[in-house]
Amino acid sequence: MYRIYDCLANQHDIVLVIIALLIGLAGIHTAFNMYARACIGRLRQKVAWLFLTGVVTGGSIWATHFIAMLSYDPVVPVGYEPVLTAVSLLIAIAATTAGFAIASVIGPNLLLSRIVGGLVVGLGISAMHFTGMSAIRVPGVISWHMDIVIGAILMGAVFGMISLWLARSAQTERQKLLGKAN
């Protein structure tokens, strides 16, 4: 645990970390509001809102992650392989779109759909993270601590499930308000 704290406290530009955090929070707020629209209306509207929710969610998660990566100072020159970097963005968008779709379309009132949808989001974010990290090019070797890798994947899965549960559970009042506005 100290390795993670030390890395964050001493090897990251705090201003960029704060910017990344603000982008993440704005993205989540926007995504939850868009997801509320995806849960009401006709099928064609739902599909469009789910796609847009996935693009906004995946894009903001990716931007948060990439800005945080840029804030890291490993004290050696760093580059990023463009194809893997772009693939990591596509993974984030695809996973969040699929996760939100599963949570809303398969059965919006079923606990299982929220859990599976959240699991897809969480594991997709983990895949985006490790794909993005694989895009890093440095004059040296990057090594992975498997305990941290496994912990990150498990945390991503759990937080994904919690996030989708909260996003869907919070829809009741928003749906009423949005329904009145339509």
Label every model-predicted segment:
Residues 1-182:
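Alpha-helical transmembrane segments and their helix-helix packing motifs
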